[in-house]
Amino acid sequence: MPRVIGIDIPDNKRLEISLTYLYGIGRHLSNEIIVKLGLDPNMRAHKLTQDDLARLNGLLTSEYMVEGDLRRQVQNNIKRLISIHSYRGMRHRLGLPVRGQRTKTNSRTRKGRRKTVANKKK
């Protein structure tokens, strides 16, 4: 398996798909990177030469924010929202949906499992 910026990418998949295994790179960005490097998008990842891997590593570290740096930036943005007590920050802190979704029903993914409440005795 070829290693790109410290992450193993699958070697039997097309290069266009293999690059999407890196955090922060989707199909569109993957195609953009392949065009910049002048590689064939249909080529399998295990056919990359050492020179191609070096160029790919150089491009990813210099021009794009991926993997650990991107994760760190997202976490810092969320911490900043929480610290300034913005509405979005409060929703993050309370573990509720942040982008205006309804919460009377649904939103179980964000809230977690149901907490059952016992009925009052008469």
UniProtKB/Swiss-Prot annotation:
Region (Disordered): 95-122
Gene Ontology MF terms in the entry: rRNA binding; structural constituent of ribosome; tRNA binding
Cleaved signal peptide residues: none
Compositionally skewed regions (Basic residues) per UniProt: 101-122
Keywords assigned: Ribonucleoprotein, Ribosomal protein, RNA-binding, rRNA-binding, tRNA-binding
TM ranges: none
Family stated for the protein in its record: Belongs to the universal ribosomal protein uS13 family.
Protein name (Swiss-Prot/TrEMBL): Small ribosomal subunit protein uS13
Protein encoded by which gene: rpsM
